[in-house]
Structure formats: structure tokens, C-alpha cells
Amino acid sequence: LPGGKSSHHLLPNAATDWSAVETIDDQNKPMHSTMNIYIGSQTKPNTNIVAYSNYPPHFKFELPMSPGKGVIMAEDNNKGFWLVHTAKYFPNLALAIRDLFSNEKTTKEAAAFLCMSYSDVNLRAIAKIIDYEQPIVFFAQKSATVQAFYDSSEIQKLVNGLHKYQPTASASGDGIATLTPPGTVKIFASAPVGYSSDIYLNYIVKIMKKSFQVYTPGTTTTVLRRSCVGTLKVENVL
């Protein structure tokens, strides 16, 4: 939004959908409060962190790969959050909270932030979904006290990459509630390159009866078939 560091947030019961929260890094504002959970902590080494972006702090230019940007943080009491955003040079976790939005690359263009709290079990499931974006992980930290989350197969695959997918197929749907119901339907599906059945048309499409997008692992060299039948659309993203 115009005005340097001006910011707005969504409130479901507000008189207007977009409510002003003044300067984004002012104390007690949404982003300040969220990021200060870690930056202001006296036990930073006890936090599990995975941060990914195609324009991380200190990079000279934007990388042309996966555009996904986000941060997963999990504490030692089985909870954490997933912050999805579009900001460049964010977050530089070495900075003080007052300097988090000090870089011109971060404030020059408008950016969106969406933060969701989850249990560590659900965060691992989210990590598995994020992995299909083939994100560029620029910062990762393993908790010094509770390491099971970081050592889980989902987080390890997200951080280290270069893994192989087993010959299985699965599908799941997730309805997203917004200020204008019914919202958006997201579909996540996976199938090996050599799978004998066309899972996308024979299974998912018949069940969901909606347009959706199919994500395939970014390491594959095989482009799956596109199909558009009526209102149904299947698109491959490599």
C-alpha cells in the first residue's frame, strides 16, 4: 500500500474490510507482535525455523525459480505459525525488531502477509505441501531443546530437498473461509511420473467437480497432460 510503511489488516467484524494499523513495525501492531515472538525471545536457539524466499536478505537480485515466500516457526510446546508473504528481503532474522522493515527493497513495493497458527503436527503437513513449490530455503534452525519437529521427514525433505517420491497417489481438499463465502477450494495431489492410472481425471476431477491446479515435483522432466473439459481445468506446474 502507498505511504512507505503504512499497513492495513482484515477484520471479519469491522465496519470496513480493510482497517488501518498505521506503521507496520510500530509496537503491538500485527507484524511487530508476530515477529517479535522470536526476535524478542531470550531463548532463540530453542526455536525451530525454516525461512524460504526467492529474494532473501543480502541477495543482489530476485531468483527466477519458485516465487514462494514464507516462514515456519515452531516452539517447544508443540505449536507454531506459518507466515506466508510477498515481501522482498524479508525476514532478516539477524535484525532488531525495529529494523525488520528498514530495507528499501522491503518497503518499496506493497506486500501481503498472512499468518496462521498451527500445532507442530499440522506444520509438518504444511511443510510437505510447500515442498511441491520447490522453495528456496535461505535460513533453517534446529531447536536446541526439542528437535523432533526439525528431524521429522517432512521438514528434512523441505530443507534438504533432492528426495524421491514413492509410487503412491493421494489427494486432499481444503476449503478456505474468506470474508465472501464460500471462499476458495485448493487441491493438492501427487502421483509418480510412471503411475499407470490418470489420477487427475479419473479420480480427483470426478470427486471435486471444480477447476483446480495440479502441482508436480519441480525435479521431474515429464510434463503431465493438460485437460480442459467444460468448467474443469487441470494445469501442470513444474
Regions inferred by a protein language model and the residue ranges of each:
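PLD/PLD-like phosphodiesterase catalytic module centered on the HKD motif
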Residues: 1-238
